[in-house]
């Protein structure tokens, strides 16, 4: 069920109706010819690299294709030159940017989707729901690369 509108805290019992019946959930979707909606990802799960929007979900999907028996999580950090840079965390000890880059090139994926850094960790943090905990991942990336800049 989707709500009919937003509750307005300044008007008890008042509901501001949604324009044209749409509610902005922050999801990126595809609506097929039968009207079925397929969720593709989240708006916030993009990095702006060199002026181009790169799906972090796609980066993870590429890594999953190259290393299917492992878990991966992509996050973006600010970059003074390119706007943002992509960091891929993985539990695969043999993961290399070169291997992922070769796969992307062979399969027509944008070179911008190749992470600048691949960080191997023991385990990708997850929420109670089993989904990747991107808040923790973002914090880990910021801390790790802040330390690298300071060194």
Each PLM stretch: what is its role?
Residues 109-132, 148:
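AMP-binding/adenylate-forming catalytic domain of the ANL superfamily
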Residues 18, 23-25, 118-120:
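Short, small/polar residue-rich loop motifs at catalytic or cofactor-binding pockets
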Residues 4-5, 21, 26-113, 132, ...:
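AMP-binding/adenylate-forming catalytic core of the ANL superfamily
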Residues 54, 124-126, 137:
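Hydrophobic pocket-lining residues within nucleotide cofactor-binding pockets
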Residues 1-16, 52-54:
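Conserved ATP/PPi-binding loop(s) of AMP-dependent carboxylate-activating enzymes
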Residues 12-15, 71, 118, 128:
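A generic alpha-helix propensity feature with a strong bias for hydrophobic helices
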Residues 139-151:
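Acidic/polar alpha-helix N-cap and adjacent early helical turns
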